[in-house]
Amino acid sequence: MLFSLGPLTIVYGLVIFVVAKTIYNLYLHPLRSYPGPLLARATRWYYSYYVKIGLLPQKTKELHDQYGPCVRIAPDELSYNTAEAWEDICGHRTGQRTESFEKDLTFFPPAPNGVDSIVRIDDVHRRFRRLLSHPMSDKALGSQQEIITGYVDQLIHELRQRSERSEVVDMVRWFNFTSFDILGDLAFGESFGCLGSGLMHPWIELIFTSIKSVMDMQIIRRIPGLFSLILTIAGLQQKQDLQEQFMFCQKKARERYTKETTRPDFMTYILRATEEKGMTPEEIEANAQILIMAGSETTASALSGTLFYLLKNSMAMQKLRQEIHATFQAEAEITMRSTQSMEYLHAVLQEAMRVYPPVPCTFPRTTPPGGAMVCGRFVPGGYIVGVNQLAAMTSEKNFKDPLKFIPERWCGDERYQEDSRKAYQPFSYGPRNCLGKNLAYAEMRLVLTRLLWNFEFDLLEESKDWHAKQKVWMMWDKGDLKVRLKPLRH
């Protein structure tokens, strides 16, 4: 029937539909009273444009600075930047709050093998979280220390060789090499070989090149009807890239879970729990890729941001070096456990993840069917809500001097007593927060302390505005963080 109509009739029909939809979104929609820019309230294309150009978190922060703690960033989506929103949206369900805000499944589709993973709905998440908590426990972390330390030793060795040749080093690449080699070993029983080769493994390269495809597919999934069909056809190459990426991970996971070994990696703990009543092989494969991505790129980003801000703030660098040398007499004393008690080191990491959150975007949820109260206002059921990390952690309403790197704010400095610390949630919040938080902190403390024990760093001029240049496609699109290293003799 559609094809029997004349082209002008179809065009007129589309124009009428767009106009009617725009009028509805602006004047009749249940979220019409929430503030936001006109185009964002009128059409999803405004949001999609900023996703496409890699500036959505930055734009969202700008909108919060302009409109306040809640912004309508798309016709069906509200963004928040407060501690109260973290509690209302992501917190534990207690008292009268019994219904959860489920993950937005448009943002979190099933794995390419069609199986649910830990990032999906609550019932599925609870089961996977119980099983995956074993390899992430403090006990497991203690048994994994030898594996992790071995790769940090290798990092120091490779950087020392390059420092003695006065080479320019891109620390972003070396942090990625380290974190991916560690997570590859913990997840698959073998590293990606990045530290040894000084090259990025092709699978990791594919992750970074395909992340824009992931965001393109998110845009496509949010556009209904004919437009979605057209864009899906146009996005077949992106889908193929994502499938290839998953197939490699699937192959590696199969190779590992068919081996018989008791080495203390993730798979040993997962398989031990699976013998009781746990994951199917397909579920292990679906979750393996998430474990590697969540535990490697984010840690590398946090380390990159931390080193950058230390190099831009000589007083903080000097204070951290003093703490390191007051704590340790020999490098062999520096371990994941011995760095736990270092107050200023912890403050530096916290502050770096505030001004440069490893995941600066929003992980959206949907309001329960009956609606819910968020920040004192009722939001009807089925709409998208979320807290934007960048907007929350760099808001002057939450933090004094929000764009300044000041580790002392985490050390009891009276100037910052009014900071809203509960707005600071780099690992998310509530029962679905990041399982790998302890592993990430342990790795970051060890790597950073060992680096500062062994080297002095000179930030090259071309990298002095490293952070300001970056765009975001879910993760920071990090440029080179170029330094020269001077080996220290102890």
From Swiss-Prot:
The record's subcellular location field reads: Membrane
Protein name stated in the entry = Cytochrome P450 monooxygenase aclL
Matching PANTHER family, A to Z?
CYTOCHROME P450, P450, PUTATIVE (EUROFUNG)-RELATED
Membrane topology per the entry is: Single-pass membrane protein
Q: Where are the transmembrane segments?
A: 1-21
Q: Name one GO molecular function term.
A: monooxygenase activity
This molecule's function is given as:
Cytochrome P450 monooxygenase; part of the gene cluster that mediates the biosynthesis of aspirochlorine (or antibiotic A30641), an unusual halogenated spiro compound with distinctive antifungal properties due to selective inhibition of protein biosynthesis, and which is also active against bacteria, viruses, and murine tumor cells. The non-ribosomal peptide synthetase (NRPS) aclP is responsible the formation of the diketopiperazine (DKP) core from the condensation of 2 phenylalanine residues.
Q: Which gene encodes it?
A: aclL
| UniProt-annotated glycosylation sites, renumbered to this chain | 176
Keyword Transmembrane helix part of the UniProt annotation: yes
The prosthetic group or cofactor this protein requires is: heme
What pathway is this protein said to act in by its record? Mycotoxin biosynthesis
InterPro entries per the record? Cyt_P450 (IPR001128), Cyt_P450_CS (IPR017972), Cyt_P450_E_grp-I (IPR002401), Cyt_P450_sf (IPR036396), Cytochrome_P450_monoxygenase (IPR050121)
Q: Where does heme bind?
A: 434
Q: Which UniProt keywords apply?
A: Glycoprotein, Heme, Iron, Membrane, Metal-binding, Monooxygenase, Oxidoreductase, Transmembrane, Transmembrane helix
Entry-linked SUPFAM superfamilies: Cytochrome P450 (SSF48264)
Q: Which Pfam families match?
A: p450
EC number(s) stated in the UniProt entry for this protein: 1.-.-.-
Q: Which GO terms describe its cellular component?
A: membrane
Similarity comment: Belongs to the cytochrome P450 family.
